[in-house]
């Protein structure tokens, strides 16, 4: 789903895997230099995660399926406190595969702060408070993907009010709805039995914007 969102906006996509540092690295027996990363990738499960993501993006059609360019850990380069795979531009998309080590929230905050990301897309975590913490602490908009079936016809529930963030949410939702052909329901909720002009105006404005995008 993340690749579909990125394609809808013509945006650069970064796939980030955060995991603990393998015990072999703590023991000093393995170095993550480029020449040893491929040799010792068996010790680093994050490499397998990035490999899976790479081939999933190819099989979905997001990346051009070129047989001569495969997933090669030798193309991992160290940058500050992360490792990034350099992919050939011939894949037809601007994409980074990034490996970070540490606590997931801390590392994602660092990643979002070091690069100019607009949206962070995360899966529904089994951790009870993980999604809530990410929504609270990441300095980007956050899209939580939960129990997605790519073969299902989805509908977007676009929640609006009179806050300043509503306009951005409407524009974002409209682009996704148009590119993915998703129907949209606009909803606003009032704390009282009457809807003030702010809430009513927000709903009308959202509906008008969606109609203009059809």
Predicted regions and their residues:
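Small/aliphatic-rich secondary-structure junction motif
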Residues: 1-43, 155-213
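Gly/Ser-rich helix-loop-strand patches that form or flank binding pockets
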Residues: 1, 6, 97-152
């Amino acid at each position: 789903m993340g690749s579909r969102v990125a394609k809808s906006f013509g945006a650069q996509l970064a796939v980030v895997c955060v995991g603990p540092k393998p015990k072999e690295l703590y023991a000093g027996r393995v170095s993550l230099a480029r020449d040893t990363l491929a040799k010792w990738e068996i010790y680093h499960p994050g490499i397998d995660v990035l490999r899976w993501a790479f081939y999933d993006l190819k099989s979905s059609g997001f990346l051009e399926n070129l047989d001569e360019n495969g997933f090669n850990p030798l193309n991992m380069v160290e940058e500050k406190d992360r490792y990034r795979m350099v992919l050939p531009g011939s894949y037809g998309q601007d994409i980074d595969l990034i490996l970070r080590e540490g606590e997931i929230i801390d590392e994602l905050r660092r990643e979002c702060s070091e690069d100019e990301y607009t949206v962070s897309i995360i899966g529904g975590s089994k951790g009870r408070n993980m999604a809530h913490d990410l929504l609270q602490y990441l300095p980007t908009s956050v899209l939580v993907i939960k129990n997605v079936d790519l073969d299902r016809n989805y509908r977007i529930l676009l929640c609006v009010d009179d806050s300043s963030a509503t306009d951005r949410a409407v524009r974002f939702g409209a682009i996704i709805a148009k590119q993915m052909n998703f129907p949209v329901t606009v909803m606003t909720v009032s704390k009282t039995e009457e809807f003030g002009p702010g809430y009513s105006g927000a709903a009308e404005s959202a509906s008008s914007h969606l109609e203009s995008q059809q």
